[in-house]
């Protein structure tokens, strides 16, 4: 784990750890030149298993490839990839706000219907973009409240593209057992669909 104050790639100062996932750690960093806040995702080399024939490193760099193509206000922009001291990193926009999970858990009342519908429409718009803006549909496979950010302007952004992939019409099934229990489709866990 990186300590606050660590300088990466002679460009970024680590401010703090802001997330941990199966594929890696996520840090808030600041650029040395203009003090802009960004996020750096570090590949976790303790991920030993191979998933669907792809190594953790292949999945990690595929995430960067997907993000480099995004041109939607509801998706963070990827700024680059780099290696530092034997570790691989993706640099992307820092999305300010709260996760939908945090909003739900901290609220004593249900999210108002009008607000929930607006967020649902924005999520559908982002998913429509992913499915229809590339040569093959991009399947976002980890939609859950902790991967949905609500910005201070009350706009939706989707984060964490580690298990996205292009739809392959030549395969009988297009899923593998990655995702979050309780949010992935049941057929995904059964190895179907």
Residue locations for each model-derived region?
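Protein kinase catalytic-loop region centered on the HRD/HxD motif
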Residues: 124-138
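Conserved activation segment of eukaryotic-like protein kinases, specifically the C-terminal portion
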Residues: 174-187
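Conserved N-lobe ATP-binding subsite of Hanks-type protein kinase domains
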Residues: 25
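Conserved short submotifs of the Hanks-type protein kinase catalytic core
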Residues: 85-99
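Activation segment signature within eukaryotic-like protein kinase domains
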Residues: 119-120
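Activation-segment/catalytic-loop signature of the eukaryotic protein kinase fold
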Residues: 81
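AlphaC helix of the eukaryotic protein kinase fold
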Residues: 47-69
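Conserved N-lobe loop of protein kinases adjacent to the ATP-binding glycine-rich P-loop
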Residues: 30-38
């Amino acid at each position: 784990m990186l300590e606050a104050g660590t300088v990466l790639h002679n460009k970024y100062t680590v401010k703090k750890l802001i997330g941990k996932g199966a594929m890696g750690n996520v840090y808030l960093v600041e650029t040395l030149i203009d003090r802009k806040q960004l996020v750096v995702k570090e590949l976790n080399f303790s991920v030993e298993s191979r998933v669907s024939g792809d190594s953790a490193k292949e999945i990690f760099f595929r995430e960067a490839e997907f993000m480099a193509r995004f041109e939607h206000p509801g998706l963070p922009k990827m700024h680059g990839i780099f290696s530092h001291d034997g570790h691989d990193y993706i640099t992307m926009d820092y999305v300010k706000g709260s996760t939908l999970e945090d909003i739900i858990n901290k609220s004593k009342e249900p999210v108002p219907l009008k607000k929930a519908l607006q967020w649902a429409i924005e999520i559908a718009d982002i998913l429509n973009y992913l499915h229809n803006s590339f040569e093959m549909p991009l399947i976002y496979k980890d939609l859950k409240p902790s991967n949905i950010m609500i910005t201070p302007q009350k706009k939706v952004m989707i984060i964490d593209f580690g298990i996205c992939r292009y739809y392959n019409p030549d395969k009988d099934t297009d899923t593998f057992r990655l995702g979050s229990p309780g949010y992935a489709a049941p057929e995904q866990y059964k190895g179907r669909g």
